[in-house]
Swiss-Prot record:
Positions bound to Cu cation: C87, C90
One Gene Ontology term from the biological process aspect of the record: photosynthetic electron transport chain
Enzyme Commission number(s) from the entry: 7.2.2.9
Family membership: Belongs to the cation transport ATPase (P-type) (TC 3.A.3) family. Type IB subfamily.
Function text: Mediates copper transfer across the chloroplast thylakoid membrane. Required for copper delivery into the thylakoids lumen, which is essential for the function of copper proteins.
Lineage, top ranks: Eukaryota, Viridiplantae, Streptophyta, Embryophyta, Tracheophyta
Membrane-related topology note: Multi-pass membrane protein
Extent of the transit peptide: 1-65
Catalyzed chemical reaction(s): Cu(2+)(in) + ATP + H2O = Cu(2+)(out) + ADP + phosphate + H(+)
Transmembrane segments: 179-199, 209-229, 250-270, 274-294, 445-465, 499-519, 822-842, 846-866
This protein's name: Copper-transporting ATPase PAA2, chloroplastic
An example molecular function term from Gene Ontology annotations: copper ion transmembrane transporter activity
Length: 883
């Protein structure tokens, strides 16, 4: 049968699993839990099964959901979905609105993902209403915003992202239609100039009829009205609304320039007595044509920048087949489906731990779980990078996002929804893209006052050329930009419009986020999760890498290679050691437990287990304490000390055991000692662990890049020296017998000496060092999350040490693109704005037209996004130098 548990819907949404043998609530739950049960179970429930158990999970989830509504911890950023951001000025305005709230400590705004991550001051009690009030302030400032609910189901999150992508695709289609309309008008405007060009070349065609009509000022005015109210309508209205909200953006600048040119032309047309001779209706048409074309190309490039994130999301299944089987069914448990089983299609958010699911060939696993029945091969390349499919049968684990290739499988859900492996990867990538690189502050500082500065420069440009420049440099009126009659008003207005239009805060606003988006998404796709732009920037500047030994340079799958004892049977020593280490999570502890299990040894009962990370584990067996760990630590646990002759004898026995076993230079050997209260050291256990295949390559590549490599280990000198020699780390950079505190201190000393340090580790004893290092890099053995991955800022989910080099290389390439983008954006504005203002006009007789300025403005943004897209061509170091 699939399950002997039945689920009952209760208000609020939760579930009860009942099993009669444990029906006595008073015995199952402490007082606090009983009060929660009474509070939530307002309706009576009835037993319809021959078993009763009240599952604690649903109550905990209900409790947590209620608490999440009441209060959000102040150190956890809330996420706001913000729409309407068009350029760097918009980003700066959104950040300014958020930071103006006294409760806000910091805010990071991402225009590409349309999100704002807000952190509050420690003394602030953050509630859902607090977040909603910030969203309301943004909406009132012209940027529609709403709080993203934390804990939202994975299907809901996928749906939300896909809706955003779909929305961008729809906008791209509309943008193309507007461009087609705008350039039709541009072609008609150009028609009036075509005859002049052909006549100047001696080709006397294109005159009369429609050509003469296109020269008519009223027709040109009509084309300008068509451009402003047709394809340019949304742009103009958005710019006007931004002015009204006191947050002008790029649309405001373009709209102001277009309307200024149109207004002056219209006044000149309807009031000929003014003798302005300022008819340049074609300028708003040409300007909008180039701007809209650039926007369309920019939107296409930004959509393409989300490709890697979309590929990650495509791995998540939002639907699943829940299998319901009768409790009295007698079908063999290894049968995929029984005759009376029912499959129900449900959202993956409705799946709970323990549910039975059916996954057919070609389908994606919706949750993490273990195989209950069936045989198949599974494509796990998205998680492991291994191209060959992996055989799965009863008892094997499967991960969400991997693909079932061959036969149907029935699985039992072990982690669901937002807790599944692929969901955690996606969430970490989203969080990473919300963490701005410190270099972004430069762009923010410039983009904030940018629009007002440009408007001021434009007004100054108009005033200078109209009142001063045209008199000091009269020859400038001979330039085509001044019109056929050399009009100072036409010259001044066009140069002022040039300044408005050529400036581009968009390039500044896109310089960092586009590169960060592509870099973090590409890293996640390749198997290394980088927790944000700030981490990328630090990672790119690393000049020293500290490596742990066990589980980092070695495979992390140690095995017992020898046991020696003093006065005890060897199996007796192994039994005691396994009993003590049973609850420990270190790979060495697991090796001892696995060895005892493989020999079918019955371990004694223990009490009061205590683990001291990096040293060993202590527990009480038969009324006496037994310690397992390093020699010094075990000796210090007990008053009775061993004679030196006993220790020499023990070492000799162990060496003899090891000499009879096959070993190679690629094996690292560690010795742990077993001590007992009142007796001292009673035995020693040798643990062997094979070096990783890519360990030597990784160290060599790091050293080739000029990065200092050091080895930090809590193991004995001999084992550490052997590993260091095999991988190529110098003896002076090898450190052994280090406690977690000593590792932490060593990292601090390296930083004090000026090094930027990355620490690579995998266990709980590495967590302090990972947190202290400039960048902590954690390997995830068998995709299990632990303290190391929680403390690290980079996680290697495929458990490949060579990905350390790849992550460093990607970070350097990403930051290189960021600096290139910022350099381009700043240089473009510094050079183009003075040229647009006419600085070259007196001496070189060169001036831009508004349409040329609009085209350059569009190209500046396209360059930034396209340059970031080149990151997708970046090759990993591993692929360049295949092992």
């Amino acid at each position: 049968m699939a399950s002997n548990l039945l689920r009952f819907p209760l208000p609020p949404p939760s579930s009860l699993h009942i099993r009669p043998s444990k029906f006595l609530v008073n015995r199952c739950f402490p007082r606090l839990r009983r009060s929660r049960i009474r509070r939530h179970c307002s309706r009576p429930f009835f037993l319809v099964s021959n078993s009763v158990e009240i599952s604690t999970q649903s109550f905990e989830s209900t409790e947590s959901s209620i608490e999440s509504v009441k209060s959000i911890t102040s150190d956890t950023p809330i996420l706001l979905d913000v729409s309407g951001m068009m350029c760097g000025g918009c980003v700066a305005r959104v950040k300014s609105v958020l930071m103006s709230d006294d409760r806000v400590a910091s805010a990071v705004v991402n225009m590409l993902t349309e999100t704002a991550a807000v952190k509050f001051k420690p003394e602030v009690e953050v509630t859902a209403d607090t977040a909603e009030s910030l969203a309301k302030r943004l909406t009132e400032s012209g940027f529609e915003a709403k709080r993203r609910v934390s804990g939202m189901g994975v299907a809901e999150n996928v749906k939300k992202w896909k809706e955003m992508v779909s929305k961008k695709e729809d906008l791209l289609v509309k943008s193309r239609n507007r461009v087609a309309f705008a350039w039709t008008l541009v072609a008609l405007c150009c028609g009036s100039h075509t005859s002049h060009i052909l006549h100047s070349l001696g080709i006397h065609i294109a005159h009369g009829g429609i050509w003469d009509l296109l020269h008519n000022s009223y027709v040109k005015g009509g084309l300008a009205v068509g451009a402003l109210l047709g394809p340019g309508r949304e742009l103009l209205f958005d710019g006007i609304k931004a002015f009204g909200k006191r947050s002008p953006n790029m649309n405001s600048l373009v709209g102001l320039g277009s309307m200024a040119a149109f207004s002056i032309s219209l006044i000149s047309l309807v009031n000929p007595e003014l003798e302005w001779d300022a008819s340049f209706f074609d300028e708003p048409v040409m300007l909008l044509g180039f701007v809209l074309l650039g926007r369309s190309l920019e939107e296409r490039a930004k959509l393409q920048a989300s490709t890697d994130m979309n590929e990650l999301l495509s791995l998540i299944s939002t639907q699943s087949r829940l299998v319901i089987t009768s409790s009295d069914n007698n079908t063999p448990v290894d049968s995929v489906l029984s005759s009376d089983s029912i499959c129900i299609n449900v959202s993956v958010d409705d799946i709970r731990v323990g549910d039975s699911l059916l996954v057919l060939p070609g389908e994606t696993f919706p949750v993490d779980g273990s195989v209950l029945a069936g045989r198949s091969v599974v494509d796990e390349s998205m998680l492991t990078g291994e191209s060959l499919p992996v055989f799965k049968e009863e008892g094997c684990s499967v991960s969400a996002g991997t693909i079932n290739w061959d036969g149907p499988l029935r699985i039992k859900a072990s982690s669901t929804g937002s807790n599944s492996t692929i969901s955690k990867i996606v969430r970490m990538v989203e969080d990473a893209q919300g963490n701005a690189a410190p270099v972004q502050r430069l762009a923010d500082a410039i983009a904030g006052p940018f629009v007002y500065t440009i408007m001021s420069l434009s007004a100054m440009t108009f005033a200078f050329w109209y009142y001063v420049g045209s008199h000091i440099f009269p020859d400038v009126l001979l330039n085509d930009i001044a019109g056929p009659d050399g009009d100072a008003l036409a010259l001044s207005l066009k140069l002022a419009v040039d300044v408005l239009v050529v400036s581009c805060p968009c390039a500044l606003g896109l310089a960092t986020p586009t590169a960060i988006l592509i870099g973090t998404s590409l890293g996640a796709k390749r198997g290394y999760l980088i927790r944000g732009g700030d981490v990328l920037e630090r990672l790119a500047s690393i000049d020293c890498v500290a490596l742990d030994k066990t589980g980092t340079l070695t495979e992390g799958r140690p095995v017992v290679s020898g046991v020696a004892s003093l006065g005890y049977e060897e199996q007796e020593v192994l039994k005691m050691a396994a009993a003590v280490e049973k609850t420990a999570t270190h790979p060495i502890a697991k090796a001892i437990v696995n060895e005892a299990e493989s020999l079918n040894l019955k371990t004694p009962e223990t009490r009061g287990q205590l683990t001291e990370p990096g040293f060993g584990t202590l527990a009480e067996i038969d009324g006496r304490f037994v310690a397992v760990g390093s020699l010094e630590w075990v000796s210090d646990r007990f008053l009775k000390k061993n004679d030196s002759s006993d220790m020499v004898k023990l070492e000799s026995l162990l060496d003899h055991k090891l000499s009879n076993t096959s070993s190679t230079s690629r094996y690292s050997k560690t010795v742990v000692y077993v001590g007992r209260e009142g007796e001292g050291i009673i035995g020693a256990i040798a643990i062997s662990d094979c070096l990783r295949q890519d360990a030597e390559f990784t160290v060599a590549r790091l050293q080739e890049k000029g990065i200092k490599t050091v080895l930090l280990s809590g193991d004995r000198e001999g084992a550490v020296a052997t590993v260091a020699k095999n991988v190529g780390i110098k003896s002076e950079s090898t450190n052994y017998s280090l406690s977690p505190e000593k590792k932490f201190e060593f990292i601090s000393n390296l930083q004090s000496s000026g090094h930027r340090v990355a620490m690579v580790g995998d266990g709980i004893n590495d967590a302090p060092s990972l947190a202290q290092a400039d960048v902590g890099i954690a390997l995830k053995i068998e995709a299990q999350e632990n303290a190391a991955s929680n403390a690290a800022s980079v996680i290697l989910v495929r458990n490949k040490l060579s990905h350390v080099v790849d992550a460093l290389s990607l970070a350097q390439a990403t930051m290189s693109k960021v600096y290139q983008n910022l350099a381009w954006a700043i240089a473009y504005n510094v050079i183009s704005i003075p040229i647009a203002a006419g600085v070259l006009l007196p001496q070189y007789d060169f001036a831009m037209t508004p349409s040329l300025s609009g085209g350059l403005m569009a190209l500046s943004s396209i360059f930034v996004v396209s340059n970031s897209l080149l990151l997708q061509l970046h090759k990993s170091e591993t692929s360049k130098n295949s092992l």
